[in-house]
Structure formats: structure tokens, C-alpha cells
Regions:
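Active-site-proximal loop/hinge segments that shape catalytic or ion-binding/gating pockets
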Residues: 65-272
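A structural detector for beta-sheet-dominated domains
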Residues: 5, 21, 30, 43-45, ...
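Tryptophan-anchored aromatic micro-motifs
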Residues: 14-20
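A short, compositionally biased
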Residues: 10-13, 36-40, 105
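Generic beta-strand hydrophobic packing signal
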Residues: 8, 32, 47-50, 56, ...
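Intrinsically disordered, low-complexity, charged/polar segments
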Residues: 49-71
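Mixed-charge, Lys/Arg-rich low-complexity intrinsically disordered regions
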Residues: 1-13
Length: 272
């Protein structure tokens, strides 16, 4: 694992993303110049690297913090590549899709603070993390998803697949190797480091036949803080209400996949 550093060669930052927030890539760092007033001037190009934008001036401490975040993101990207992780997934009711395509996926707290109407997938958040959104790596938590569908047989459901770059950009994502509401975690537990991401693929009890992109425990989850912007959505998968969902995804510019295997269970279900 990486060691965060206390000294940097500031020119090593050239070519990396600059983040206007902790999860939105804003620009590419084009040049860094040390200024006479002990500030560092970062010149930026737009995200497509086609034109110059304004510069920002940072103190050395701010520059160091920026560099360490970039190191974490680089390592996280390497983990996703090594595990061949192509998507994270989130299931919801079809009736929520129109709002989700417009506003992104929002936490319960964000939704309650807004005027957005929604139908919750989980009435009882036992993890009590109402500022977080539950997702899974590569395949839904099929035990929970199945139980929700059985409890609500008249409700149409959808699985949204999401670009895993989201967890590279959002450094406050939390990684749980089993269900966050399992009772083994304290309320103030905050597993945001890359070590916790790796722990989701622990060897003990792992079925050797599941894809390496699957976490060991099918109830493992990633909690995303407050919002998942719709720019990260890759596709939507459903089994019912196909014409409605097709129309919504076409308008939103998102791929649609009917009769998805993501409504099934993992091949290692007998172990769990």
C-alpha cells in the first residue's frame, strides 16, 4: 500500500486531474510554477485537454494534500484494473428512474432535504447511514434484492450499472467486506482507505470459480456519500415495464438491457 509523503516534486503533478471537489474531475494540470510568495501556481487545461483555463494558487500544504489524494486515486485505479472491475451496481424501483436520471442518485438525507418525491427501496436503514448510498461491486446483493422483490411483487425494479471511476473520484467512499448493517461495525466506523477496498476480496472462504471482480461476500457493499451524479451511469437493466424504461433511458442517453442476469444470483450461492 502507498505511503503518503511529506515532500513532493511539484512538477510530478503535471498531467493529473485537478478536482474542483472531492469527486468531480474539473481539469488537467498543465503546469506548476513556484511563485516568489511561497505559493504554487497550477495552470489548468479543460478535461479534454484542448484549451487553457484559469490557474489556481495553492500553499505548499494544499499542494501536498492534492498530491496525496492523487496517489490514493492512482492506487485505487490500479486495484480496479487488477480486479477487472467494470461496474458498480445499485438497485431501485422503476418509479424512481425519471428523478434519478434528472438528479442523480441521492442519499435519504439529501432527498428529505429536497422537494424530490421518491419511493425508498429500504424503509429501515439498519446501518443508520442516511447520508450514504448503498452499491455493490459487479453484482447486486442478490439476497437483499430478492427479498425486496418478494416483499413487493407488484413493484417493478431496475438495476443501474455505474462507472467504477466514481469511487476513484469520491475518496470518501466506504468499503465493507460484508453488509454494513450486519452489526459488526460501529456507527463511527469509516473504512475509506484502499486497504478496505482490497479486504472485500479476502481469500478465506472465497469460491475459486467466481470472477475476480466479485467481492468474496455477496453482501459486501460500497457506501457512496450523498450523491452519485448521473454522468457516471452506464446502463439500466429491468425485467418488467420494458417499454417505459426503454423510453426513459433513450431520453437520458443511457444504455438499456432487458432480462438481465443481475436479477439472478451468484454461482456461489450455496456457500452463503
Amino acid at each position: 500500500m502507498i505511503n503518503l509523503i511529506k515532500n513532493i516534486n511539484y512538477r510530478d503533478l503535471i498531467g493529473y486531474y485537478y478536482y474542483i471537489s472531492d469527486y468531480i474531475p474539473y481539469a488537467i494540470i498543465d503546469n506548476v510554477i513556484k511563485m516568489p510568495n511561497n505559493y504554487y501556481r497550477i495552470y489548468l487545461k479543460d478535461i479534454k485537454n484542448t484549451k487553457y483555463l484559469n490557474y489556481v494558487d495553492l500553499t505548499y500544504e494544499e499542494l501536498l494534500s492534492l498530491n496525496n489524494k492523487l496517489l490514493i486515486r492512482k492506487e485505487r485505479s490500479e486495484i480496479l484494473k487488477e480486479r477487472n472491475i467494470k461496474k458498480i451496481v445499485h438497485f431501485t424501483k422503476v418509479e424512481n428512474l425519471e428523478s434519478i436520471f434528472e438528479n442523480g442518485i441521492l442519499s435519504v438525507n439529501r432527498l428529505n432535504d429536497s422537494s424530490i418525491a421518491y419511493s425508498p427501496s429500504d424503509l429501515f436503514r439498519l446501518d443508520d447511514k442516511l447520508n450514504m448510498i448503498s452499491t455493490s461491486i459487479s453484482f447486486p446483493n442478490y439476497k437483499m434484492f430478492y427479498s425486496k422483490r418478494m416483499e413487493n411483487p407488484d413493484i417493478d425494479w431496475a438495476v443501474i450499472t455505474i462507472d467504477p471511476k466514481l469511487i476513484i473520484h469520491k475518496l470518501d467512499s466506504e468499503f465493507y467486506k460484508t453488509n454494513a448493517a450486519s452489526g459488526i461495525y460501529s456507527f463511527d466506523y469509516s473504512p475509506t482507505s484502499n486497504n478496505f477496498l482490497l479486504d472485500m476480496f479476502y481469500d478465506e472462504g472465497r469460491d475459486p470459480n467466481i470472477p475476480k471482480s466479485y467481492p468474496t461476500d455477496p453482501q459486501a457493499e460500497i457506501l457512496i456519500n450523498n450523491k452519485m451524479p448521473n454522468t457516471y451511469f452506464n446502463s439500466v437493466e429491468t425485467r418488467k415495464n420494458i417499454s417505459k424504461v426503454k423510453s426513459l433511458t433513450r431520453t437520458a442517453g443511457i444504455d438499456y438491457n432487458p432480462n438481465s442476469h443481475l436479477f439472478s444470483y451468484r454461482s456461489d450461492y450455496k456457500r452463503w
